[in-house]
Amino acid sequence: MSIETFTPTPLLFTPGAANKVKTLIDEEGNPRLKLRVFVTGGGCSGFQYGFTFDEDIADDDTVIERDGVGLVVDPMSFQYLAGSEVDYQEGLEGSRFVIKNPNAATTCGCGQSFSI
C-alpha cells in the first residue's frame, strides 16, 4: 500500500495587493483585520469571487502573510483558488482586487465570475 501526500498549490498574494490591504487596514485602525477572499455560487459564469475584511480566522482557514498583512481563504474556496494570484489593479475601469485563476475555464467580462 502506498500513501500519496497532496500539497495544494499556494495562492500568490502580490506585493501590490498586500500594500493596498495594509493601507485599508491602517485607515480602519484595526491591525487584527485580514483580507478574506472567497468563492460563492452565482455570477454570469457560475461562481463568483468575494472579498471582505475579517478579524476571525477559523482553524481550517489558510492564511497567507505578505509584508505584515494576511490573506485568508476558507477550505471550500481554496479548492477553486489554488494556484491563483490575488492582485490589486488601478485603471480606467476603477480600482479593485483581482484574481488571476488558472483553474477557470471561462471568466466573465468583468472578471468577477468564472466557471471550472
Swiss-Prot record:
Coiled coil: none annotated. Keywords: Iron, Iron-sulfur, Metal-binding. GO terms for cellular component: cytosol. It comes from the Bacteria. Iron-sulfur cluster binds at C44, C108, C110. GO terms for biological process: iron-sulfur cluster assembly. One of its GO terms (molecular function) is 4 iron, 4 sulfur cluster binding. Pfam families: Fe-S_biosyn. Binds 1 iron-sulfur cluster per subunit. InterPro entries: FeS_biogenesis, FeS_cluster_insertion, FeS_cluster_insertion_CS, FeS_cluster_insertion_RrpA, HesB-like_dom_sf. Its cofactor is iron-sulfur cluster. Required for insertion of 4Fe-4S clusters for at least IspG. NCBIfam families: iron-sulfur cluster assembly accessory protein (TIGR00049), PRK13623.1 (NF010147). Homodimer. Belongs to the HesB/IscA family. This is Iron-sulfur cluster insertion protein ErpA. It comes from Pseudomonas aeruginosa (strain ATCC 15692 / DSM 22644 / CIP 104116 / JCM 14847 / LMG 12228 / 1C / PRS 101 / PAO1).
